[in-house]
Each structure stands twice: as structure tokens, then as C-alpha cells.
């Protein structure tokens, strides 16, 4: 994962985990830093995701320089990008058609306008209509997109509204319902016009912030979404995650969705603009720090977490707790960043219960669907 502009973004979502991380310098990722990182990769196949902050803030010229480095890499490379979509325009799509035609573009949008209320600008103004313009433009250009929906309290009990609002957009072919299971997370006190909203939602970084849900609430939302997706036979229109991955997992098949994959966070490596290298970007920094382009000796060292034995111990301990669980083969350990946040909070068992609840619901529905 390449953090092109670091934490810099053109909006200020209340729940953004990237803006909770320490960033000593405001930098853009430079070609020479990427080149050093690619040297560490040693020609192995790479699935590169352009991320931020907002990756489009880097601009077309600088992104073109980074694409040139990726094209010169000795191994196979696929590229995807996660954006809020606000800066996406015809010029950007022309650029991608020219520089990396098969790039996969994901857009973040929390369902309908009501659900998207935590995705605001720096004055707490809504961003929904700016994003939907990008979805319409993508359809006009014949491009498909995946949408990540963060399941906050704003959309609990409204799964049908959320899915119906997204299904109206021709470009949307994948919808991923991502949990917002924040607990004991501290928001940085940025001097922005909407800092008061963050202080109200998350005053002291203790317990559950105002946007988050419990694992059980998330499970109920997922089941509600699955029922609506099935009843409307929308599986022919768009893929709904995590259910595609749950079905594959129940069938003993691999999936790329980390939460239901045997390949966990160590298989995700994040490059920051200043050359720092971390594990999955969903893990907090500096706790997930693995080194830098100047200190790392190779990708094997990074993937095995040799440079951060404490992180390796913590993640291994979580997976060890799965031994003997009736759902171990289908659950595959869940999302380790969420489980780490819940350690010692009393929510550990509820997290596992949510996983079993969702898996059992899907498993029971499969014979009927067949």
C-alpha cells in the first residue's frame, strides 16, 4: 500500500484512522523512495494500492512519475486506488487511460446522504453530492467501481436504504460493508473549523466514539443487508462483501478479503512518504512500524515481522486463540486490527460471536439459495 500524500486529505471524516497516526512531516511520496522500496520487493508479484489521505492530491505529474517507477519494476504489478472521488474528473480518467488503463478504482461512500454524514469537509459540510457526481462520470466512461461503506451508527437498521441508494449507480459493481469497530482511539486535536464535532464525538479517546458500533450491532446490520441483497436478487447486479468472501470461505476456497483470508496483516506492507514501512495501514503507528527503505534488508524480513517481534507476538497470540474454535476454518481469524483494539476491553468474545453469527446465517441460507 502506497500512502501517496500521507495523511493529507481534502475532507475530514470523523472516523479517519489515518489522521490519528503520527506524521512528523507533511510529504508526498517521491519516486526515489518508491524505487528503494521496489528494490526490497525483489521482483515478487505486487498488488499495489494507491491510498492516503486522498491519493489524487499528489497531482497527475507526480503520480505519473510514480507510475513510471512501477512500470520499470522487474516483477508483475497490478494497481488499484481508493479515493473519496471528489477530485476525480475527466482529466484524471484520461490520465489513467493513458498511464495505467486497467487500474481498479474504489470510492468511499457510506451509502445514502444520511449515512454519509461522517464524511464531511473541514467545516462539517456534506460531501455526498460531490461523490455521486464521480460515480455518474465513471458510468459515462464505461468504468466500474467498488464502493467501501463504513458501517457507522448512522446506517444501523437501514441496510435496505443503503444498498438501494448504491444500486442506482450503474458504475457500482462491488459494495464492501466495512466495520467501524473503534474502541479507545484518540483523535488528534487538529485546529480545524470542525474540531468541536470531533471533540463531541470522541472527547477523550476512551471507550467507543460516537460513530462506532459494537460487534453485535455490526453483525445485525450485515445480516439485514444479506437478507435484502438476497431477496432483491441483487447478486446479479453487484457483489456484496463480506458475503462473497464468507461463501468462498465456507466452500474452502481462498479469498483476498483479509478478514476471511489465511493471509493476514503481515502480507500487507505500507510505504509512507518519508520512507517508513509499516504493516497493514489499519494497524496503529508506531506500533506497526517495520523499518524504513534505508534500514530494511528485504521483503522477507518485513513479511515475517522480524523487525517488530512485539507485533508478531501480539498477532500470533490472537490467532492462537482460534485453535479449537468450531468456526476456525471458515472465520480464519477475523480482522486482527479490530481484535487488537478489543484486547482487554470485554468485547473480545462479542467480536467472535459476531463472526459466528454472520457465518452461520450465510451457511443456513446457502442450501435454500441452491
Model-derived features: positions:
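Short glycine-enriched, charge-decorated loop/helix-capping segments at active-site entrances
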Residues: 19-24, 118-125, 340-342
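Structural preference for beta-strand elements that scaffold enzyme active sites
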Residues: 1, 45-49, 78-80, 104-106, ...
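Conserved alpha-helical substructure of the radical SAM core
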Residues: 1-103
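Flexible mid-to-C-terminal extensions adjoining Fe-S/redox cofactors in radical SAM and related proteins
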Residues: 276, 282-370
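Short, flexible loop/turn elements at secondary-structure junctions
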Residues: 4-6, 54, 83-87, 109-111, ...
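Internal, well-ordered domain-core segments that constitute the primary functional module
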Residues: 62, 77, 97, 103-106, ...
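Radical SAM enzyme [4Fe-4S]-AdoMet core and its adjacent flexible, acidic
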Residues: 32, 119-132, 136, 140-265, ...
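Non-cysteine beta-strand/loop elements that form the S-adenosyl-L-methionine
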Residues: 2, 93, 97, 101-113, ...
Amino acid at each position: 500500500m502506497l500512502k501517496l500524500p500521507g495523511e493529507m486529505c481534502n475532507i475530514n471524516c470523523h472516523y479517519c484512522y489515518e489522521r490519528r497516526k503520527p506524521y512528523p512531516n507533511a510529504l508526498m511520496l517521491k519516486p526515489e523512495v518508491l524505487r528503494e522500496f521496489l528494490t526490497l520487493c525483489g521482483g515478487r508479484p505486487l498488488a499495489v494500492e494507491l491510498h492516503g489521505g486522498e491519493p489524487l492530491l499528489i497531482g497527475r505529474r507526480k503520480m505519473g512519475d510514480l507510475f513510471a517507477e512501477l512500470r520499470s519494476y522487474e516483477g508483475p504489478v497490478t494497481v488499484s486506488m481508493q479515493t473519496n472521488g471528489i477530485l476525480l474528473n475527466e482529466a484524471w480518467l484520461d490520465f489513467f487511460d493513458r498511464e495505467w488503463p486497467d487500474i481498479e478504482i474504489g470510492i468511499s461512500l457510506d451509502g445514502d446522504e444520511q449515512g454519509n454524514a461522517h464524511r464531511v469537509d473541514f467545516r462539517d459540510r456534506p460531501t455526498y453530492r460531490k461523490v455521486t457526481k464521480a460515480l455518474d462520470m465513471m458510468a459515462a466512461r464505461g468504468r466500474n467501481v467498488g464502493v467501501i461503506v463504513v458501517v457507522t451508527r448512522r446506517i444501523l437498521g437501514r441496510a435496505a436504504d443503503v444498498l438501494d441508494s448504491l444500486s442506482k449507480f450503474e458504475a457500482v459493481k462491488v459494495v464492501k460493508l466495512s466495520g467501524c469497530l473503534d474502541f479507545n482511539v484518540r483523535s488528534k486535536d487538529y485546529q480545524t473549523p470542525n474540531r468541536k464535532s470531533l471533540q463531541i464525538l470522541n472527547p477523550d479517546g476512551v471507550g467507543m466514539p460516537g460513530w462506532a458500533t459494537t460487534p453485535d450491532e455490526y453483525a445485525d446490520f450485515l445480516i439485514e443487508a444479506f437478507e435484502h441483497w438476497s431477496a432483491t436478487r441483487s447478486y446479479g447486479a453487484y457483489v456484496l462483501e463480506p458475503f462473497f468472501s464468507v461463501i468462498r470461505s465456507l466452500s474452502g476456497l481462498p479469498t483476498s478479503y483479509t478478514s476471511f483470508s489465511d493471509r493476514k496483516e503481515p502480507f500487507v506492507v505500507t510505504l509512507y512518504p518519508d520512507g517508513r514501512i509499516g504493516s497493514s495501514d489499519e494497524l496503529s503507528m508506531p506500533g506497526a512500524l517495520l523499518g524504513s527503505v534505508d534500514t530494511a534488508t528485504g521483503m522477507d524480513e518485513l513479511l515475517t515481522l522480524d523487525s517488530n517481534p512485539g507485533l508478531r507476538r501480539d498477532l500470533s497470540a490472537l490467532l492462537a486463540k482460534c485453535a479449537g474454535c468450531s468456526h476456525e476454518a471458515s472465520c480464519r481469524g477475523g480482522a486482527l486490527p479490530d481484535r487488537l483494539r478489543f484486547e482487554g476491553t470485554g468485547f473480545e468474545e462479542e467480536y467472535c460471536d459476531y463472526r459466528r453469527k454472520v457465518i452461520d446465517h450465510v451457511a443456513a441460507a446457502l442450501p435454500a439459495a441452491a
